Amino acid sequence: MEVERQVHTPLHSIHAIPNQHPIAIIPDGSQKRAKIDMMRRAHEAASQYDPSITQTSVGISNSIQNVLIANSNGLLVEDTRTYTRMRISAIATDGEHRQSGFRGPGAYAGTEFLENLNIEENARHAARIASTMVKAGYAPSGRLPVVIENGFGGVLFHEACGHGLESTAVAHGTSVFANKIGQQVASPLVTAI
């Protein structure tokens, strides 16, 4: 019995692919002073937002990843992925409680992303979250009706109930829904489609 086999000869060349994220300013050590100034601006904007802000933390990170992709059809391509991100954290205290706010804008871009970013607005956003949280009252507890919007609600439902409805868990009797066919397992107000 003869088996037919196909062998693909590698192309031995790297193909160029269109750059989806052109980099205007490649991140390197020459931008240290500019980055320090950007972080100082974020710190000042967050710190001055409200007297409850007692601490801030700001960081900038850049990563450059060189990727080589090859497949059995002889395709060989390379890609360079440059990512830039600013992380802004603010802590608010009221003497008894402590809350934090965070903002972390980033993009597949070079340092130009930071130059085009409204740093002060992002810093104030992080501070606003912390300040609002530290001044907020406690959420009501107990049984409450919940309405979940379409979209992300599906993810919430899956995490809350979906894993328990997976066939292997039900078949092995390890699911809370095992042996519940025909029985009510949630509020009569719950409808999952």
Predicted regions and their residues:
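Active-site bordering "gate/hinge" segments
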Residues: M1-I193
